[in-house]
């Protein structure tokens, strides 16, 4: 068998509302989650609704580049 790129890759999900609003004095930072995705099943960017401890609500977290 040919050895190519790994099918499962590690991705970092970042809160889109924290990034959009910018890190102001009220916000202490930007929420990030680390997870894995199957490159064959989801070739596009991954977006999940996760809890952001800085926004105090569930927001959309998008995949970022490493």
Curated annotation (Swiss-Prot):
Localization terms from the record: Plastid, Chloroplast
Residues spanning the membrane: none
Any one GO molecular function term: structural constituent of ribosome
Highest taxon, organism lineage: Eukaryota
A biological-process GO annotation: translation
GO cellular component: chloroplast; ribonucleoprotein complex; ribosome
PROSITE patterns in the record: RIBOSOMAL_L33
InterPro entries assigned: Ribosomal_bL33 (IPR001705), Ribosomal_bL33_CS (IPR018264), Ribosomal_bL33_sf (IPR038584), Ribosomal_zn-bd (IPR011332)
Keywords in alphabetical order: Chloroplast, Plastid, Ribonucleoprotein, Ribosomal protein
Disulphide linkage map: none
Assigned protein family: Belongs to the bacterial ribosomal protein bL33 family.
NCBIfam families: PRK00504.1, PRK00595.1, rpmG_bact
Name of the protein described by the UniProt record: Large ribosomal subunit protein bL33c
Originating species: Citrus sinensis (Sweet orange)
Lineage, highest ranks first: Eukaryota, Viridiplantae, Streptophyta, Embryophyta, Tracheophyta
């Amino acid at each position: 068998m040919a050895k190519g790129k790994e099918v499962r890759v590690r991705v970092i999900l970042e809160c889109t509302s924290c990034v959009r609003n910018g890190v102001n004095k009220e916000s202490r930072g930007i929420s990030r989650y680390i997870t894995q995705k199957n490159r064959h099943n989801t070739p596009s960017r991954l977006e999940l609704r996760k809890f952001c401890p800085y926004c105090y609500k569930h927001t959309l977290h998008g995949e970022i580049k490493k």
